[in-house]
Amino acid sequence: MRTVPFVFSLTALACAGQRSGQAPSPRAAGGDTTQSSSLGAGAASTPNANPFPSTYRPYPARTTVIRNASILTAAGPLIQSGSVVLRDGKIAAVGASVDAPADAVVIDGTGKYVTPGLVDTHSHLGVYPAPGGQALSDGNEATSPVMANVWAEHSVWPQDPQFPRNLAGGVTTLQVLPGSANLIGGRSVVLKVVPARTVQGMKFPGAKYGLKMACGENPKRVYASRGPSTRMGNVAGYRSAWVQAEQYRRRWDKWNRDHQGDAPTRDLGNETLAEVLRGNIFVHNHCYRADEMAQMMDIAKEFGYKIRSFHHGVEAYKVADLLARDSISASIWSDWGGFKMEALDGIRANLALVHRAGARAIVHSDDPSGSQRLTQDAAKGMAAGNAIGIRVTDEDAIKWVTINAAWALGLDSQIGSLEPGKNADVVLWSGNPFSVYTRAEKVWVDGAMLYDRADPSEQWRTDFELGFVPAQRGGTPGRNP
């Protein structure tokens, strides 16, 4: 038995990489074979639009069948005593009765549940890593209210020990955002929760970037002495930034069309905002109050961009019909509220009311501990809705942490539900995932089992934790929680 379970060591990886002719280790970091653009068809109008491409490479996977489990697919009704087949990194089959390939590893899921891998739309893992401290506090570039030129991925520390703890909670994909100090905080990045030496080795291939924007109290507080110091100052700041970005986009579009004279001077901030205007980057907007969400929708219409998701949104229930009308998702908590003035009107039925209105409700975390318990937060939102007469089923609530969140990241065709052809991001739970007594037992990413609660050798530890000696319990090596 290994003293240090599932050690992901940079030194070991570097040495392994020097052995010519050898295949990468099953636990080696993502290689450099997959380079995938994060921008869409309009990206050609931005020079070098993808300078930091994903180098993620799936880990070796074995054909696996989980039998006799209750399956919440996030695409239909609960399947009782069903089976899921994982093959070649994809969901090969799911249903009440499926054939098991002869070479498959068969897992008995009697009394257990299977769900898609969880998706967290709002994380700061890696940019505010553990242990907390100023030396590792890299989530807010609070030097100007508009910082569209910064990219969260350039602050992500892949050795953050919170990553493996999120995997142990069933999270397989997350969006890391800049903080909310600024009106425009910079680009977000979508990561797979996998061991890697670099952030590029974690980047979800082909995932679009996001733009973090923030309303309300946080920018006011941070910039009170420099401005903006009021909500009307905030709005003026957004609009000024978009005016400049639109002018920048037109200059580049004209040059790309005519190729006359010298190319316009590049500006990293306007480059990001121009990609939003072209539809290549999603807007993720930190916003608590209903009136401010409505104002941000108006600004988006003024400048012709789309808001993909409002984050936190404790008053989303007040404008749920507007969210549904404009196809804007709400990435929200189950029961956080009242902790500052703009959160005063938070209610526990927020998720259920957004869901009833036909908008996409999403449970997000904004917290390294909460992201380990996303299904428990979904359970609280489900209970609050049922308590006021809004029927929310397990089949509804699982979507709040899977397919709806995947949609907010533009990845719902690849992840977020258990359907043939989708990525085999799968969680086997010890019981109903909405119970506080349930734990994730096994977690697969692209068909590779990267977490096994019962086997310390299949539990990822970052380099930061090398040298950690598990506690001894009754003379046997302890296991990670």
Where are these regions (language model features)?
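His/Asp/Glu-enriched, well-ordered alpha-helical/loop segment
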Residues: 55, 60, 130-131, 137-143, ...
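Divalent metal-coordination and catalytic microenvironments
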Residues: 69, 84, 89, 111, ...
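Polyanionic/metal-chelating signatures
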Residues: 162, 167-311, 439, 445, ...
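Histidine-rich, glycine-flanked metal-binding segment
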Residues: 48-49, 53-62, 71, 75-115, ...
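C-terminal motif of bacterial Sec signal peptides marking the signal peptidase cleavage site
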Residues: 13-14
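N-terminal pre-domain segments of enzymes
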Residues: 18-61, 469-479
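Metal-associated gating/positioning segment near the N- to mid-region
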Residues: 112-189
